[in-house]
Amino acid sequence: MSTDPASETAATAAAGPGPAAEPAAGPGRVAVIVPAAGKGERLGPGAPKALRELGGFPLLVHAVRTLAAARSVDLVVVAAPPDPQGLAEVQRLVADLPGDTRVVAGGASRQESVALALAALPEDCAVVLVHDAARALTPVDVIEAVVAAVRGGAGAVIPVLPVADTIKAVDGDLVTATVDRSTLRAVQTPQGFTRGVLTKAHAASDPAAPATDDAGLVEALGLPVRTVPGHAEAFKITTPFDLVLAEAVLRRRR
């Protein structure tokens, strides 16, 4: 599916002054890490977020199927809940999916899960994407654009959308300022990296002060992070209302 007109307006921001970009990824394979060990309390009690059903299949299954459909992706590694039951359930779900999909035990946090999956990748994987299972409807075009940007020489790449709402800074219940949204972008996944950049970023990270995404770890090193246009359908399914929206998108696709 091609990107919608709104996503075409997302700026591809050039990095400002700073350290030179890391070397290009080289000819190695492309792997995607899917951290799927989180509980996802905002969706309410029940199964882990990645295992919540959408249209009769878990979010994780939708996400892995889409990744497998991307021609540039060679391998998907799912970081599953570390308990035996959760690990076995994820292994069962992905066993018959297309493509090369492997499962490793995740950690106590998203950051730890990504680090564990990264350490388990085969040595010939030169490009590594990290993708939220909860962004189960991300179009293949977004995945391909991220990979192409890394292959083209970027050390870190994120898909983004312009911010549509007016943004206010507040102190308690008082507005203190209206934020200029012209330079703001909403960040999506998959986020793409050369393996060296992502490995270096996780090695330097502080588990006591986790970043909200992997690009944040790269930023902390002072390395540039590039952008490509995201897509409205790559939204994160986090709340019950998001599930309603996702069901509507699925019905339209069918």
Residue ranges and their predicted role:
Residues S2-D4, E8-A10, G16, I237-R254:
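Hydrophobic helical membrane-anchoring modules
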Residues L93-V127:
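Short phosphate-binding loop-to-helix
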Residues V34, L60, A117, H131-D132, ...:
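Residue-level signal for inorganic ion chemistry
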